[in-house]
């Protein structure tokens, strides 16, 4: 049985930085069930004390020391959070002092700098990419001329969350195409995709894991049947191989890793926002 550990991502901004780094760290450890909670915009002492109380309550509930991944810039807020007795992991602390020495300059304690709306062009690019991902989700729209990437996979293999992550974090216009039973009758690309071969990236998944995911969505249906999952995954993988479409298994791969692999494979040079 997995050991439960409560984890809090605390930030004076959106919390994206703390959560991204924290998630990457936690994936290095097995045998634990991490109960995570993101606390965003903890930017004054009152909010910090409220956060401290919630963290303490979690420790009492689970009878174990909570873990806090903290990206608050104001050190006075971090001190309040530390009163919770949690293990405090400061996102910036290991890097600020060496950088200050190297650059001979003190940091600017600017709240929300990592994900602020300082660059409006960048902000609008992310919003437009997000709208594109939603419009072109699950084959809703099939005009892919403006797409940077088109993720192709069977249903519930991780297409949608990856597209949204690519949009929000990289401003990438990511569409996705769900392979249907009709598509899988052939080992060739569906007609709608043939003109966009260079934009395609295939996602595959272990059939047992796919069955678990589908069972949660449509219990005891043909859609969630293990044989159906095996047949669809096998047919999709044959298609990807025949058409030489780059492919990645999402079974044990985080969205962050999938996104990085997609960008690198398709040669999309984008900075993380």
From Swiss-Prot:
Organism (species): Stenotrophomonas maltophilia (strain R551-3)
Protein name per its UniProtKB record: Putative phosphoenolpyruvate synthase regulatory protein
EC numbers for this chain: 2.7.11.33, 2.7.4.28
Binding residues for ADP: 153-160
Family that this chain belongs to: Belongs to the pyruvate, phosphate/water dikinase regulatory protein family. PSRP subfamily.
PANTHER family: PYRUVATE, PHOSPHATE DIKINASE REGULATORY PROTEIN 1, CHLOROPLASTIC
Enzyme class: transferase
GO molecular function, one term: ATP binding
Described function: Bifunctional serine/threonine kinase and phosphorylase involved in the regulation of the phosphoenolpyruvate synthase (PEPS) by catalyzing its phosphorylation/dephosphorylation.
């Amino acid at each position: 049985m997995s050991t439960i550990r409560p984890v809090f991502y605390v930030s004076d901004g959106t919390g994206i930085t703390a959560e991204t780094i924290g998630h990457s760290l936690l994936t290095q450890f097995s045998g634990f069930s991490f109960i995570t909670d993101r606390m965003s915009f903890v930017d004054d002492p009152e909010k910090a004390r409220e956060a401290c109380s919630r963290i303490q309550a979690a420790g009492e509930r689970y009878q174990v020391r909570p873990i806090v991944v903290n990206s608050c810039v104001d050190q006075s807020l971090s001190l309040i959070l530390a009163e919770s007795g949690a293990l405090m992991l400061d996102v910036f602390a290991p890097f600020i002092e060496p950088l200050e020495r190297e650059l001979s300059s003190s940091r600017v304690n600017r709240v929300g700098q990592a994900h602020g709306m300082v660059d409006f062009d960048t902000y609008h690019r992310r919003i437009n990419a997000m709208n594109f991902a939603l419009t072109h989700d699950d084959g809703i729209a099939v005009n892919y001329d403006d797409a940077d990437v088109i993720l192709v996979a069977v249903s519930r293999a991780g297409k949608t969350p990856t597209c949204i992550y690519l949009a929000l974090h990289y401003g990438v216009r990511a569409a996705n195409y769900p392979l249907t039973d009709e598509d899988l009758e052939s080992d060739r690309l569906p007609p709608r995709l043939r003109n966009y071969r260079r934009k395609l990236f295939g996602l595959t998944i272990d059939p047992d894991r796919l069955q678990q995911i589908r069972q949660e969505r449509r219990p005891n249906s043909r859609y969630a049947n293990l044989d159906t999952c095996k047949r669809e995954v096998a047919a999709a993988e044959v298609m990807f191989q025949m058409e030489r479409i780059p492919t990645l298994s999402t079974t044990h791969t985080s969205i962050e890793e999938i996104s990085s692999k997609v960008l690198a494979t398709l040669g999309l040079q984008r900075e993380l926002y």
